Amino acid sequence: VASGVLYCYIDGAARGNPGPAGIGVILTDQDGAVLREIARYLGETTNNVAEYRALLAALEEALRRGAEEVIIYSDSELLVRQLLGTYRVRSAHLLPLFRRARELMGRFRRVTVRHIGRERNARADRLANRAIDEKLNT
């Protein structure tokens, strides 16, 4: 990554809660050029687990690419507020994912987490849903 900064748009989707789930991740450079898209089927899980799994996939890919700074965009208010410390992680099945995310976040010089509206995250949402559709239609 030339500038050392990666922009990550993440989304998790589940049909039913729990239900068939997938993640969508888009990594771009500072000019908005897409460096990587990830669409991955997760199996049966909850929407919130899918959101965290999308975050972990983005952070792992950013580390692989040698990014020093990561800016995460998510439409999940729960995920963003938990990462910022304004919501406590009460769910036992989210706690290990939260801890892993914090551990990965600590490897970067800086991580910024921003809440965005669904309309600004439509592309990541499409990837997450495509992963589910491709699995269910095979």
Residue ranges, per PLM feature:
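RNase H-like nuclease fold core
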Residues: 1-49, 59-68
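RNase H catalytic domain
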Residues: 10-17, 56-129, 134-136
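Short, conserved alpha-helix that lines the donor NDP-sugar binding/gating region
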Residues: 51, 55
